[in-house]
Amino acid sequence: DHLFVSYEAITSHLIDRITDAFIQAGEFRQIRIHGDCHPGNVLWTDNGPHFVDLDDCVTGPAVQDLWLFLSGDRESRSRQLQDLLEGYSQFYNFDYRELYLIEALRTLRMINYTAWIARRWIDPAFPRAFPWFSENKYWEEHILALKEQAAILEEPPLEIA
C-alpha cells in the first residue's frame, strides 16, 4: 500500500515537472522520428550504420532520437550532445529549445516502460519474462529513480559550448 501511495505521489509530481519542461521548450517542430533510437538499435555494417527496430516510429521532437545516445555525468552528456548536434546539424536544423525536453522525455520513458509491463501483466509470458516486476524491491528502486529524476528536472537543461 505504501508503495502505491509513493508511486502515485511521485508520478503526479513528475507530470507537473514534465509539463513545465514542455512549456519552457515552447512550440517545437514535429517530425518523423525513430522513437526508440539508441546504440542497440543501430546495426553497423561495412556500408555504415542502419537503424533497426522501427516499430516505435512516431511523430515528435528531434531530440527524442538523440537523448538516448547520451550517458555518463552531466559534463560527459554535454560533450556527447555537442558532438551529436554537430553531426545532426549537417543534415537538419536543430531547435535548441528542445534541450528542455531531454529529462522530461527520459522521465516519460521510465514511467511508460513500467506501464507497458503492467498493462501486459495478465499475459503469462510477462511474469516469466519480468519476475522482478511484482517484487517490492523493484518498486522501491523505481520510485527512488523517479525521485532522482525529479531532482534532475529541477536543473537547467544540458548546455553545449
Residue ranges and their predicted role:
Residues 96-106:
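All-alpha amphipathic helical-bundle segments outside canonical DNA-binding/catalytic cores
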Residues 19-66:
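Active-site acidic catalytic loop and adjacent metal/ATP-binding pocket
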Residues 12-15, 82-85, 140:
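Hydrophobic core segments within long, regular secondary-structure runs in both alpha-
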Residues 1-35, 152-159:
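An alpha-helical support segment within catalytic cores of ATP-dependent transferases
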